[in-house]
Amino acid sequence: MYQMNAKMHFTFVFALLVVSFNLDVLGKNLKYRIYEEQRVGSVIARLSEDVADVLVKLPNPSTVRFRAMQRGNTPLLVVNEDNGEISIGAKIDREQLCQKNLNCSIEFDVITLPTEHLQLFHIEVEVLDINDNSPQFSRSLIPIEISESAAVGTRIPLDSAFDPDVGENSLHTYSLSANDFFNIEVRTRTDGAKYAELIVVRELDRELKSSYELQLTASDMGVPQRSGSSILKISISDSNDNSPAFEQQSYIIQLLENSPVGTLLLDLNATDPDEGANGKIVYSFSSHVSPKIIETFKIDSERGHLTLFKQVDYEITKSYEIDVQAQDLGPNSIPAHCKIIIKVVDVNDNKPEISINLMSPGKEEISYIFEGDPIDTFVALVRVQDKDSGLNGEIVCKLHGHGHFKLQKTYENNYLILTNATLDREKRSEYSLTVIAEDKGTPSLSTVKHFTVQINDINDNPPHFQRSRYEFAISENNSPGAYITTVTATDPDLGENGQVTYTILESFILGSSITTYDTIDPSNGAIYALRIFDHEEVSQITFVVEARDGGSPKQLVSNTTVVLTIIDENDNVPVVIGPALRNNTAEISIPKGAESGFHVTRIRAIDRDSGVNAELSCSIVAGNEENIFVIDPRSCDIHTNVSMESVPYTEWELSVVIQDKGNPQLHTKVLLKCVIFEYAESVTSTAMTSVSQAPLDVSMIIIISLGAICAVLLVIMVLFATRCNREKKDTRSYNCRVAESTYQHHPKRPSRQIHKGDITLVPTVNGTLPIRSHHRSSPSSSPTLERGQMGSRQSHNSHQSLNSLVTISSNHVPENFSLELTHATPAVEVSQLLSMLHQGQYQPRPSFRGNKYSRSYRYALQDMDKFSLKDSGRGDSEAGDSDYDLGRDSPIDRLLGEGFSDLFLTDGRIPAAMRLCTEECRVLGHSDQCWMPPLPSPSSDYRSNMFIPGEEFPAQPQQQHPHQSLEDDVQPVDSGEKKKSFSTFGKDSPSEEDSGDTSTSSLLSEMSSVFQRLLPASLDTYSECTEMDRSNSLERRKGPLPAKTVGYPQGVAAWAASTHFQNPTNNSGPPLGTHSSVQPSSKWLPAMEEIPENYEEDDFDNVLNHLNDGKHELMDASELVAEINKLLQDVRQS
């Protein structure tokens, strides 16, 4: 028994795979066996493994799902949809499920999803019995009465034990406890049940023993074996002479299963020869018959009629075995027994049964499928059955309703209902189908079952507008929120698939979003205005309305175009654009000689409205009582109606009305003042009027304005470039003194050749050289500080320059010339000297130039160009040029410290070669007079004594004094002459008049250098200058540094010359700058290098200090500059 229980804890399953019919939708029939009473959840099989050979043929076997099509509310077996795992869903009791049927199985169908590639598997699970029940007797004590006269071999049927198990687990045998008088025999009924009969094996003697108690045991053959027992209580009665007897010991009766209740099955006829009570018989069922017999049949106890008490069913019980007994009423009656076997005859009494299994949940009579599914889509599984046997149980199944569906048999009595066409819910949403099952019995029985197929909606229809374009009109000046129209789209889909939402697609009108003009109700498509429409602003609004359904997963849309026309209203008055109006009045000029028909003017007006509302007409409403003027109502041209000469008036005021043709009419009134002029004046006035009447072209105004701005900018750029170019030219002159003073502060650079045009001579004043520091502390030194430093030296430099001018003039006066000076101030002395020079009261002494320096110093000067503060003036700065070299000591400083003592002998005597030397040579250096012989006469040609740079001059001393100044007069480059001047180095062109011109030019050059120092170096001294002079002065001050000689243009030499080269006795006479004036003498040359002899070398610093402390009077710079420039111009021209 315990071994059997152990087996029940595991699943004993085997599968029988049967290849089914050759149908595409049918995979296999699968059979499995399990024992009953298995634990819930126990796995029976996995379809994904068992039908892998079928699934592999599908397009996507990994995505296949399984669904069980079972009957009943509580399935005993469940199927996992993912892997097809079959497991126990509820407790399975075979005795309850199948009772005493030998074959007990659970059948259901499994389909694969999706249904496009449907596969049907028929599953049959056989439930095997386990010995879980013991045989049981209905009574625990069974009484039996036997007459003592019973013969040996008498059989008495005993109560049967009941065991619900089947097979070997059911009742198998009976046994009786040991005794000497009775025995039992096991017999089998027609239904397979076993029962026992008690057999008398020895004669009974009541006197010896009147009763017996024996144990009757019923046992099965299961493992473990189970049994049940009951007590037989046998009573021995006295002998009765006669006992009842049946005609037959057994009867077999054929009973049609459709026999009605009350049908007489058998008339039992038992006889008893006794009379009276001993001969009266009573019929009854034996005590051991089953309750089922008692429920189905009935026996009449007096007459012995066996009748049908309950309808029998062949499909449930095919036969019955009944034990009846007859017993008289006498004492010690012995009952007689008879066996009746009733065989139920099958008749076609059962109609076929139809069961429809639907894949979708819900009511059994409704199947749901989606529209658009392909052909052969699974709809339902139909199973038919008939309890009858033979032809009565053979069924023919049919499908009626619509050709879009078909019925396909799978196996036995199972059918599939499939789609035979693609369904469209919008055409037909529901189908009523009828399944008819008919057997082949006689007469034939049939069953009809109806069910409904509903088509589920999918979002396969976009919203649909009745028209692709809607046109509506609305008047302008509407109120905001005014209703315009409604556009409607229909969607035949259901639910959210057919729920339409309306929107206006984004677009722009005049830069504004369409949603600022119109809006639409998303639910019903009603369109409303959001603003006041103006026909003049926009006459037509076009936008797109989108209808979108609420389908899922993809929403479908459709569009329609809405054209909204704005109807014009007469809401704009005419506007006059010509002639030009002021205060709604225009002045019109008419010539006096205008004849009749003369065109006076045309009134031009516009109306922003359109159509009839914009059609204008003109009329004169006042001021034309005498019909002097006529007006064309359409063109609005005004003409004279009479000759103006005959009109006595000179002025009219005409009131002209311009009105449109709208409803209501709008008008504008203008006043025309007509004035008659004489012809010439009127022509001008008319022309001006016509010009004034011409409309201004905005584009032309913009073009003219841009052109004027560009022209002004161009002029400013040209002026700026010209000024910058002039400043460059001014600052490109080469300044020897500055270059010399800055030489030692620069690193050695490659030498380059200098040019004449790059040199500007700077005079030495009283033997002093400008060898002060010329450097700034930093490149960013303040210009204000620079001006302050320059201003602090102004008086000192001016005083020096005046004294130098006196010296120059004195050196050029002959020895026999009596010089009387007032010595009032340096300025007055200069004025007197210049006057004498101008009158030609002396002959200049010769001055030999160009041989002032030794060969080594000349070579040093040749290299000076690479340290120049100015470029050459021929373009961009050249390599080696330095426009702003500061902080260098002059090479002259080095020369001053070298050969000063070499010019004298050890005993203090002057060498013969230097007999002409003076004390000033010790300060300024040796001049040409030191070694050159004097000229025979003042008019002698001294040019033969000139030293030309670059030539060997063996007679010249090897060491020259380094302090001799280079005062070279350079012929102006911009003079109109093409000849080259070598006057800088003492060489001139071989022209007859060159001597005088050269003298004049030399003097002016030296005067220019001197008078440059007279110019003020701060802004304070220019307060009386003109604005232009001040600007020029500021521009010139940009180049030099503090304590330097200010570099001015060459023309500044006229600063003193033009003022003092006049007749001192007649200051009112014309200046020398004119041709009629007395020309300055050209017979003299300046000698800038000569200074008074009373200056010693040791007194050099004292001289400088004395000059710094000196005070002098400033001159009017503006007048001097103007007159000197005139003088230079005249000199150059001569």
UniProtKB/Swiss-Prot annotation:
Q: Which residues are glycosylated?
A: 103, 269, 559
Name a Pfam family for this protein.
Cadherin
Where is the stretch described as Disordered? Answer: 768-800, 868-888, 941-1003
The answer to whether UniProt assigns keyword Transmembrane helix to this entry is: yes
- Signal peptide positions (record): 1-27
Q: Where is this region: Interaction with DAB1?
A: 892-1134
Q: Where is the composition biased (Basic and acidic residues)?
A: 868-877
Answer yes or no on keyword Calcium: yes
The record's annotation in InterPro entries points to: Cadherin-like_dom, Cadherin-like_sf, Cadherin_CS, Cadherin_N, Protocadherin/Cadherin-CA
Cadherin domain ranges (all copies): 28-137, 138-246, 247-354, 361-465, 466-576, 582-697
Highest taxon in the source lineage: Eukaryota
One Gene Ontology term from the biological process aspect of the record: homophilic cell adhesion via plasma membrane adhesion molecules
Main location as per UniProt: membrane
Q: Which GO terms describe its cellular component?
A: plasma membrane
Q: Which residues lie on this side of the membrane: Extracellular?
A: 28-699
Residue stretches spanning the membrane = 700-720
Q: Where in the cell is it found?
A: Cell membrane
**Tell me, what does this protein do in biology?**
Potential calcium-dependent cell-adhesion protein.
Q: How does it assemble?
A: Interacts with DAB1.
What is the designated name of this protein? Answer: Protocadherin-18
